[in-house]
Amino acid sequence: MYAIVRAGAKQQKVAVGDVIEIDQVETAAGEKVTLPVVLVVDGETVTSDAKKLDKASVTAEVLGGTKGPKIVIQKYKNKTGYKKRQGHRQKYTQVKVTDISL
């Protein structure tokens, strides 16, 4: 059995026991998080009906926070002396999927 869950602006395929990275969630390590379900596949049965998915839930345990790779942004305008350098590092939360229920 696996499910497609929405975490932030992304959708990810998860099964019980998977460790995934989602956009940062303000919860402490060890707490439980419920992720919204988009689709559930159980063997040959595919559930995508909105009424049935309202009852479905994916529970995950927060393992901790991580950071993504450093991204460097550079801007340059010729002949004007304009230069700009900026960096960004996205924060993620690692979670372990503990239960998928319909």
UniProtKB/Swiss-Prot annotation:
Top-level taxon in the UniProt lineage: Bacteria
SUPFAM superfamilies in the cross-refs: L21p-like
Coiled-coil annotated residue ranges, if any: none
Pfam families: Ribosomal_L21p
GO molecular function: rRNA binding; structural constituent of ribosome
A Gene Ontology biological process term: translation
Swiss-Prot/TrEMBL keywords: Ribonucleoprotein, Ribosomal protein, RNA-binding, rRNA-binding
Database matches in InterPro entries: bL21-like, bL21-like_sf, Ribosomal_bL21, Ribosomal_bL21_CS
CC terms in the record's Gene Ontology section: cytoplasm; ribonucleoprotein complex; ribosome
PANTHER family per UniProt: 50S RIBOSOMAL PROTEIN L21, LARGE RIBOSOMAL SUBUNIT PROTEIN BL21M
HAMAP family: Ribosomal_bL21 (MF_01363)
Annotated function: This protein binds to 23S rRNA in the presence of protein L20.
Subunit: Part of the 50S ribosomal subunit. Contacts protein L20.
Family membership noted in the UniProt record: Belongs to the bacterial ribosomal protein bL21 family.
UniProt protein name: Large ribosomal subunit protein bL21
Species this chain originates from: Nocardioides sp. (strain ATCC BAA-499 / JS614)
